[in-house]
């Protein structure tokens, strides 16, 4: 009888976990990927760290020459910080390594088929709506379902620097290989350069700055009238799980914690 581990969720944390487990578990294990196809990714675009690319290299034999375009990704060599100090500065990735800017709407359809092709004996993919992890009959479960819906088993820090994001995308390719991180009067703004669009996110605390004020300041930076900004926005609390390991269940990615998205720590750690 094979040992089993289920990975629930196919966002960036779930896909990275699948690549890692397929690579390092031997054929005495069965790995089950479970996701609900009705749940859509936030679809903003994401700046990753080198371990994500490393997991893709070992998990699906990813290489930037052949696979950047079909995955709708771009190379990331670091982050550029603007207006945090008198002069802008670049924070390069360590030791000449590279990472990826990814389209969260595109990565599942790129990665899952390649995992199935490379690991046909080890991997099984299921479409299933999971409400109760304890009802799943597997030896171990990795919970990668993103933001929690119930915070009773989480701790929320009393102070929150930012908790809301306004999103706007220009329908033109990004032109740099850096994640943009610009200080603003309300918080900071990210920009993610992708092959098909350039996405900006204005991050602020809605307990301090009103939505209308944030939109006005965001539109001024982008030189886009407030009425023409994309309607995409979302809130995100800061939190961390009281326990990451709970018997046979392990929380990963945003299911485990979220403090501040500037360093992509939920995926990196």
Question: Language-model segments: which ranges?
Answer:
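FAD/FMN-dependent oxidoreductases across multiple families
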Residues: 101, 204-269
């Amino acid at each position: 009888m094979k040992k089993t581990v289920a990975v629930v969720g196919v966002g960036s944390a779930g896909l990275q976990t699948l690549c890692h487990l397929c690579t390092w578990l031997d054929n005495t294990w069965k790995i089950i990927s479970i996701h609900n196809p009705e749940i859509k990714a936030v679809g903003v675009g994401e700046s990753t760290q080198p371990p994500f690319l490393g997991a893709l290299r070992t998990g699906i034999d990813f290489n930037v020459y052949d696979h950047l375009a079909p995955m709708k990704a771009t190379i990331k060599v670091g982050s550029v910080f603007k207006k945090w100090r008198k002069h802008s500065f670049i924070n390069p990735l360590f030791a000449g390594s590279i990472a990826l800017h990814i389209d969260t709407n595109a990565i599942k359809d790129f990665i899952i088929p390649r995992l199935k092709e490379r690991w046909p004996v080890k991997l099984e993919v299921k479409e299933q709506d999971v409400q109760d992890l304890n009802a799943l009959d597997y030896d171990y479960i990795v919970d990668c379902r993103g933001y929690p819906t119930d915070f009773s088993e989480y701790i929320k820090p009393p102070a929150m620097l930012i908790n809301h994001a306004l999103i706007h995308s220009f329908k033109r390719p990004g032109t740099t290989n850096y994640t943009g991180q610009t200080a603003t009067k309300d918080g900071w703004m990210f920009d993610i350069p992708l092959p098909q669009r350039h996405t900006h996110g204005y991050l602020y605390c809605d307990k301090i700055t009103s939505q209308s004020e944030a939109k006005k300041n965001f539109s001024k930076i982008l030189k886009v009238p407030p009425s023409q900004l994309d309607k995409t926005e979302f809130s995100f609390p800061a939190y961390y799980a009281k326990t990451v390991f709970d018997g046979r269940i392990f929380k990963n990615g945003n299911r485990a914690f979220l403090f501040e998205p500037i360093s992509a720590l939920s995926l990196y750690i």
